[in-house]
């Protein structure tokens, strides 16, 4: 499983296009080619207890249409040193 490293301030995700939802997560909207269509998915970083556990997950993901965008976004986070692999 992939997760955001414990020492990462979640505000760093905003540099990569994620927006904060006051409840408990940051999300990045993955659009199909037409940004104005209702064809979209979310790449979500979930922050349980807002600080202790941060995991990367998908919500409403149509992997057939948005797989490449999702993988590229996760790759960007890995390259920036924000993500680590952990045993689930």
Give residue ranges: language-model regions.
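Intrinsically disordered, low-complexity regulatory regions enriched in serine/threonine/proline
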Residues: 1-2, 6, 10, 27, ...
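Short secondary-structure junctions
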Residues: 15-23, 82-87
């Amino acid at each position: 499983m992939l997760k955001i490293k414990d020492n990462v301030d979640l505000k760093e995700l905003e540099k990569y296009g994620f927006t904060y939802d006051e409840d408990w997560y940051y999300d990045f909207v993955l659009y199909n080619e037409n940004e104005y269509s209702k064809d979209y998915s979310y790449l979500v970083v979930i922050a349980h207890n807002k600080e202790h556990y941060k995991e990367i997950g998908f919500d409403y993901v149509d992997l057939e249409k948005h797989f490449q965008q999702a993988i590229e976004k996760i790759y960007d986070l890995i390259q920036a040193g924000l993500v680590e692999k952990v045993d689930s």
